[in-house]
């Protein structure tokens, strides 16, 4: 089955637009993006893994986590939730950080919107970067390929969790 996956970089707007369709129930897809135990199973591009130190999914709450390489190298990030409309939309500020939770600015604003159509869930993600240099560095470091791998990890995980 071919599921929609669109990934567009708009350098002039310092924004990345992503649309991804999943063959799963909206509530399950929502949980996959908002629950640490599920996020850690798919969000890191293989062979890296994700390790959440803490996550408080509420407005003003934060998620502090690391992407861990097979050699044990950790790349920390912090996310602060700025808006949540359950099972519809959430927004967060994302920045790399050190292991002591000190953010490395500039960061980026992420806006996730969830909808259901014909039994499938569509996730629209808009990533606005505070600086073009940050966005270019993010892409240069392999963000596009890594994010696509993560979305495929999620698709495979959902296939195992969601039986129609």
Where are these regions (language model features)?
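Short, highly charged C-terminal tails/helix-capping segments
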Residues: 158-164
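Helix-adjacent hinge/juxtasegments
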Residues: 62-93
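A short, structured loop/turn motif at beta-sheet edges
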Residues: 26-27, 56-58, 82-89, 113-122
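Hydrophobic/aromatic beta-strand elements that line small-molecule binding cavities or substrate pockets
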Residues: 20, 52-53, 77-83, 108-115
């Amino acid at each position: 089955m071919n599921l929609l996956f669109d990934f567009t970089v708009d350098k002039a707007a310092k924004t990345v637009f992503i649309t991804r369709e999943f063959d799963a129930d909206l509530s399950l897809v929502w949980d996959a993006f908002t629950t640490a135990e599920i996020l850690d199973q798919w969000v890191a591009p293989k062979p890296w893994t994700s390790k959440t130190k803490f996550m408080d999914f509420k407005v003003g709450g934060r998620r502090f986590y690391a992407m861990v390489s097979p050699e044990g190298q950790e790349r920390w990030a912090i996310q602060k939730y700025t808006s949540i409309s359950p099972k519809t939309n959430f927004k967060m500020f994302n920045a790399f950080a050190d292991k002591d939770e000190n953010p490395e600015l500039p960061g980026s604003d992420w806006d996730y919107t969830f909808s259901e159509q014909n039994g499938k869930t569509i996730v629209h993600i808009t990533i606005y970067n505070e600086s073009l240099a940050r966005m270019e560095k993010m892409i240069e470091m392999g963000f596009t390929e890594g994010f696509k791998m993560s979305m495929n990890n999620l698709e495979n995980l959902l296939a195992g969790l969601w039986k129609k």
